[in-house]
Design a protein with these regions (language model features):
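The substrate-binding groove and active-site-proximal loops of carbohydrate-active enzymes
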Residues: 46-60, 97-106, 172-179, 215-221
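Substrate-binding cleft of secreted/luminal carbohydrate-active enzymes
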Residues: 152-166, 175-271
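Aromatic-lined carbohydrate-recognition surfaces of secreted/lumenal glycan-active proteins
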Residues: 6, 11-21, 78-85, 99-142, ...
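Active-site-adjacent "subsite" loops/lids of carbohydrate-active enzymes
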Residues: 2-3, 19-71
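Alpha/beta enzyme core
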Residues: 64-79, 83-86
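Short, acidic/polar
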Residues: 56-70, 136-148, 222-239
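Generic structural signal for well-ordered alpha-helices
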Residues: 2-3, 66-67, 108-116, 145, ...
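Glycine-rich, proline-tolerant flexible connector loops at the mouths of alpha/beta enzymes
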Residues: 81-102, 165-166, 170
């Protein structure tokens, strides 16, 4: 399959759902979050299981999977769900490894550092909550933009307008304002990274943004106009810093995408 995709000039990314995992908890329940009230494996609002973000063996397992994917010829590994759980009865969670004293942002940062240390030459990327672009307190999930940036080839903030809270930058329903939401978020993110790179004393970082955009109906109907608005907002936000532009991606959980929002690129050497 990888060869076929490469033959079609397709860049192949393998995505790993890291700490939200529906198989590893069954094989290694000792590494999973569990319920303090029932003693069973804890599940979020969707009935999904989670691993302890601080468990070293969970880090080892996911990094080993990433190495195998790269060894099999994939161009990049994308790490998703690189965070603490955020939905469900969080007060009922017991962590077998996290001491509940170490900052969540430091736990996740150390995992990111470990990824880069173990995969120094392979291309890796990470998905972050969209609000991480403007927030610096970790959002309760441990994600911090400046902590993630040095360790990945691409950072993918999920700046879905529907996921922003009512009243965000004055919009009662942010989903109705895709350009404004994405532009504001990426403007702030770019400013933060420019400042980070200016203060770096090591070799210049080569990381880039490659955000996820909304192509699904939530909060508003997402047609070609709204999808294009996000793309335009991103291009406008990155216009002054093309070195940070790593492209963009669309997300639809049903894999049904708005073709009219996309433009065909010219085929190389075409007549």
């Amino acid at each position: 399959l990888v060869k076929r995709l490469h033959d079609e000039n397709i860049y192949v990314i393998g995505r790993i759902a890291v700490f939200q995992d529906q198989r590893l908890p069954l094989a290694r329940p000792d590494l999973a979050l569990y319920s303090s009230s029932t003693g069973q494996i804890w599940k979020d609002n969707k009935g999904l299981m989670w691993m302890d973000t601080a468990a070293p063996e969970v880090w080892d397992y996911n990094i080993a999977v990433a190495k195998e994917l790269l060894a099999r010829g994939l161009d990049e590994v994308n790490f998703d769900y690189v965070r603490f759980a955020s939905d469900g009865n969080l007060n009922d969670i017991k962590h077998p490894f996290w001491d509940e004293k170490t900052l969540k942002t430091h736990i996740v940062r150390d995992f990111f550092d470990r990824i880069r240390a173990e995969i120094p030459d392979g291309r890796v990327s990470a998905d972050l909550f969209g609000l991480v672009t403007i927030n610096k307190d970790g959002l309760g999930i441990g994600q911090h933009l400046e902590y993630a940036w040095p360790d990945f080839d691409a950072i993918a903030p999920m700046v879905y307008p529907s996921h922003y809270f009512p009243g965000f930058i004055g919009f009662e329903n942010p989903a109705d304002y895709p350009y404004e939401i994405v532009k504001y978020s990426m403007d702030v993110a770019v400013k933060r990274i420019v400042a980070l790179q200016a203060s770096a004393s090591t070799t210049p970082m080569t990381d880039r943004f490659r955000p996820w955009f909304q192509d699904f109906n939530l909060g508003a109907t997402y047609d070609a106009v709204k999808v294009k608005a996000q793309i335009q907002a991103y291009e406008d936000a990155l216009a002054g810093h093309p070195e940070l532009d790593g492209g963009w991606m669309l997300w639809n959980p049903s894999n049904i995408y708005t073709k009219d929002a996309l433009e065909e690129e010219p085929i190389a050497n075409s007549q």
